[in-house]
């Protein structure tokens, strides 16, 4: 009888990033809880540390999904109304410039809440796997803009004047555009990001734009690899 070959199960590199990020979470901290698949892994593992090790922290969620995840895993929640400054925020990213550590976020449409909470933190940690690292920001990923619905046409016109390539993000499971947790639309735009700090400001200066997905205030990026995690700092 032929012997079956053992199937090797590859570890998720993101879990190595998550476990490294958890080392920075201490008792008594107020923690910003990011959104997205990698951030969800962090929320799940943080919940385990609370239930199994008695870690005493409070979370501030950045989206409906992260709130539901935190409740599911028993993370006590507070709001920015109670704490205007957080000790730390841990979030994922769609693209990370491996030299500058500037990132693009917002593939899930939550970047407005994410930026508010992430930028309120004393320390912002981004957790990713190696596939999210790029040499030049915006290589493969457009910058998302959350836009007031009645202003989408004027915002598109302003973006075209900036030699960019904008498009309204359309929904997969319903007719019409994607609608954010805040009731707004999303415009995705490919634009020159040689100076992301300046573009971040320029995009937000367009009337009707609520927030954009360029994040330039990252303190650490933790890159999960198959056998370890690497910490990148500015």
Swiss-Prot record:
Pathway(s) annotated for this protein in UniProt? Carbohydrate degradation; pentose phosphate pathway; D-ribose 5-phosphate from D-ribulose 5-phosphate (non-oxidative stage): step 1/1
Tell me if Isomerase is a UniProt keyword of this record.
Answer: yes
Reactions catalysed, as given in the entry: aldehydo-D-ribose 5-phosphate = D-ribulose 5-phosphate
Cellular component aspect of the GO annotation: cytosol
Q: What is its EC number?
A: 5.3.1.6
Note the superkingdom of the native organism: Archaea
- What are its GO biological-process terms? D-ribose metabolic process; pentose-phosphate shunt, non-oxidative branch
Q: Which UniProt keywords apply?
A: Isomerase
Alphabetically, the GO molecular function entries are:
ribose-5-phosphate isomerase activity
Pfam families, sorted? Rib_5-P_isom_A
Q: Which residues bind substrate?
A: 35-38, 91-94, 105-108, 132
Mind telling me which PANTHER family this protein's record contains?
Answer: RIBOSE-5-PHOSPHATE ISOMERASE
Subunit (UniProt): Homodimer.
Write down the NCBIfam families for this protein, in alphabetical order: PRK00702.1, rpiA
Q: Which protein is depicted?
A: Ribose-5-phosphate isomerase A
Origin species, per record, is Methanococcus aeolicus (strain ATCC BAA-1280 / DSM 17508 / OCM 812 / Nankai-3)
Name the encoding gene, please: rpiA
């Amino acid at each position: 009888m032929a012997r079956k070959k053992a199937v090797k199960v590859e570890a998720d590199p993101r879990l190595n990033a998550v476990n490294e990020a958890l080392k920075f979470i201490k008792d008594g901290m107020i923690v910003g809880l990011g959104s997205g698949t990698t951030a969800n892994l962090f929320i799940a593992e943080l919940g385990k540390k609370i239930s199994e090790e008695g870690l005493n922290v409070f979370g501030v969620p950045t989206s409906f999904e992260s709130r539901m995840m935190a409740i599911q895993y028993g993370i006590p929640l507070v709001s920015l109304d109670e704490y205007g400054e957080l000790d730390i925020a841990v979030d994922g990213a769609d693209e990370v410039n491996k030299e500058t550590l500037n990132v693009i976020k917002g593939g899930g449409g939550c970047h407005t809440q994410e930026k508010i909470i992430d930028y309120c933190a004393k320390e912002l940690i981004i957790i990713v796997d190696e596939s999210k690292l790029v040499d030049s920001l915006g290589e493969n990923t457009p910058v998302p803009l959350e836009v007031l619905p009645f202003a989408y046409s004027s915002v598109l016109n302003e973006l075209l004047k900036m030699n960019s390539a904008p498009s309204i993000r359309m929904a997969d499971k319903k007719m019409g555009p994607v609608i954010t947790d805040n009731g707004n639309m999303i415009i995705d735009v490919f634009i020159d990001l040689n100076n992301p700090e300046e573009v971040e400001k320029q995009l937000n200066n367009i009337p009707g734009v609520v927030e954009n997905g360029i994040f330039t205030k990252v303190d650490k990026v933790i890159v999960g690899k198959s056998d370890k995690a690497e910490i990148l700092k500015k």
